[in-house]
């Protein structure tokens, strides 16, 4: 771009120098005495060349040839005043055209800046006023969303004695509530489901702590001891079953000791099964089988039948507890 601009400036400078040289050359012949209509026309055209170059610097040669060509058919010999008038009107029109867009542009710029400045104080002055209430509204929301201060300020739920008694009775039956049971219990006690759920959670954790510390034996809460003692009776129950099996095997070595071994092995599994099943009252079928085992165990002692037949009953009695144990 700079090279093109420099070339244009050099061309303009050369055309101005040529125009000034022709101006000096044409001004000398009229002083010598060769004045005619052609001389007037050439001098007038040469006089106006330097005036054309400032107004239209880039296309000076074309404009000068255009006006000189237009001058000869119109003016003829006495057309000396016509180019002055024509050029004056053109220059006036050009200056007017140049001034009109410039004035319009200046007014447009001024209007834009005025409008911008009129909006600027509104934007700067109103934005802090609008931001302050937003900050005030957001601060309580942040406190609410945090939740921790709200949880600290939340009051504790105070249960009545009737509600506590009903919850305790339900907890003794089962430690875990299904969704329909929890909804029914909450509606009957006038509590929310969340309050019932949290009470059961707290009660379970408290019961586990008390049971682990030994404050609550498992016999006092057979129904409520479903979850914590659930790990211990299976440990003790296989021990009783295993204890009965070696005793039975050891007792079965001699023909005379088979009866006593059968009696002891039949009684110990039945007692272990009854003790184990006592912790689970909802297993009605298994508790029935345990009572059946307790009923069949005493029948083995009085009926001292011959050894092979009694040995057959011994295997039958030993097979029944094993089949009951497979339920677990």
UniProtKB/Swiss-Prot annotation:
| Pfam families, per database record | DLL_N (PF12413), Homeodomain (PF00046)
SMART domains documented for this protein? HOX
Annotated compartments: Nucleus
The family assignment reads: Belongs to the distal-less homeobox family.
Top-rank taxon:
Eukaryota
* Purpose: Acts as a transcriptional activator. Activates transcription of CGA/alpha-GSU, via binding to the downstream activin regulatory element (DARE) in the gene promoter. Plays a role in terminal differentiation of interneurons, such as amacrine and bipolar cells in the developing retina. Likely to play a regulatory role in the development of the ventral forebrain. May play a role in craniofacial patterning and morphogenesis.
Cellular component, GO, one term: chromatin
Location of the region described as Disordered in the Swiss-Prot/TrEMBL record: 16-81, 211-270, 300-328
Source species taxonomy: Eukaryota, Metazoa, Chordata, Craniata, Vertebrata
GO biological process entries:
brain development; branching morphogenesis of a nerve; cartilage development; cell differentiation; cerebral cortex GABAergic interneuron fate commitment; embryonic cranial skeleton morphogenesis; embryonic skeletal system development; hippocampus development
Q: Which residue numbers delimit the DNA-binding region?
A: 152-211
MF-aspect GO terms: chromatin binding; DNA-binding transcription activator activity, RNA polymerase II-specific; DNA-binding transcription factor activity; DNA-binding transcription factor activity, RNA polymerase II-specific; RNA polymerase II cis-regulatory region sequence-specific DNA binding; sequence-specific double-stranded DNA binding; single-stranded RNA binding; transcription cis-regulatory region binding
Residues modified to Phosphoserine: 232
Q: Which InterPro entries match?
A: Distal-less_Homeobox_TF (IPR050460), Distal-less_N (IPR022135), HD (IPR001356), HD_metazoa (IPR020479), Homeobox_CS (IPR017970), Homeodomain-like_sf (IPR009057), HTH_motif (IPR000047)
Q: How does it assemble?
A: Interacts (via homeobox DNA-binding domain) with POU4F2; this interaction enhances retinal ganglion cell (RGC) differentiation.
Residue spans with biased composition (Gly residues)?
250-264
Q: Give the matching PROSITE patterns.
A: HOMEOBOX_1, HOMEOBOX_2
Keywords attached to this Swiss-Prot or TrEMBL record, sorted alphabetically, are:
Activator, Developmental protein, Differentiation, DNA-binding, Homeobox, Nucleus, Phosphoprotein, Transcription, Transcription regulation
Q: Where is the composition biased (Polar residues)?
A: 16-28, 52-72
Task: Report the protein name in the record.
Answer: Homeobox protein DLX-2
Q: What is its main location?
A: nucleus
Known Gene3D superfamilies for this protein?
Homeodomain-like
């Amino acid at each position: 771009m700079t090279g093109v601009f420099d070339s244009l400036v050099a061309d303009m400078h050369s055309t101005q120098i040529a125009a000034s040289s022709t101006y000096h050359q044409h001004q000398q012949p009229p002083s010598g005495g060769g004045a005619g209509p052609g001389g007037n026309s050439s001098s007038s055209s040469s006089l106006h060349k330097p005036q054309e170059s400032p107004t239209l610097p880039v296309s000076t040669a074309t404009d000068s040839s255009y006006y000189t060509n237009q001058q000869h058919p119109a003016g003829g010999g006495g057309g000396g005043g016509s180019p002055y008038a024509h050029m004056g009107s053109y220059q006036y029109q050009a200056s007017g055209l140049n001034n009109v867009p410039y004035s319009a542009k200046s007014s447009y710029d001024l209007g834009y800046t005025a409008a911008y400045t009129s909006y600027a104080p509104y934007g700067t002055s109103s934005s802090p006023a609008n931001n302050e209430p937003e900050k005030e509204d957001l601060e309580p929301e942040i406190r609410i969303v945090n939740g921790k201060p709200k949880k600290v300020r939340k009051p504790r739920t105070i249960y009545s004695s009737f509600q506590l008694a009903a919850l305790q009775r339900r907890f003794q039956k089962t430690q875990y509530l299904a969704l329909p049971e929890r909804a029914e219990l909450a509606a009957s006690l006038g509590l929310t489901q969340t309050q019932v759920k949290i009470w059961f959670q707290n009660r379970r954790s408290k019961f586990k702590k008390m049971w682990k510390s030994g404050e609550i034996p498992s016999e006092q809460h057979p129904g409520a001891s479903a979850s914590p003692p659930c790990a211990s009776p299976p440990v003790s129950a296989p021990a009783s079953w295993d204890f009965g099996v070696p005793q039975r095997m050891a007792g079965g070595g001699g023909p005379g000791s088979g009866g006593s071994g059968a009696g002891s092995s039949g009684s110990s599994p039945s007692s272990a099964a009854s003790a184990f099943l006592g912790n689970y009252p909802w297993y009605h079928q298994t508790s029935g089988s345990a009572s059946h085992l307790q009923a069949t165990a005493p029948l083995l002692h009085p009926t001292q039948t011959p050894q092979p037949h009694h040995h057959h009953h011994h295997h039958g009695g030993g097979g029944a507890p094993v089949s009951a144990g497979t339920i677990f």
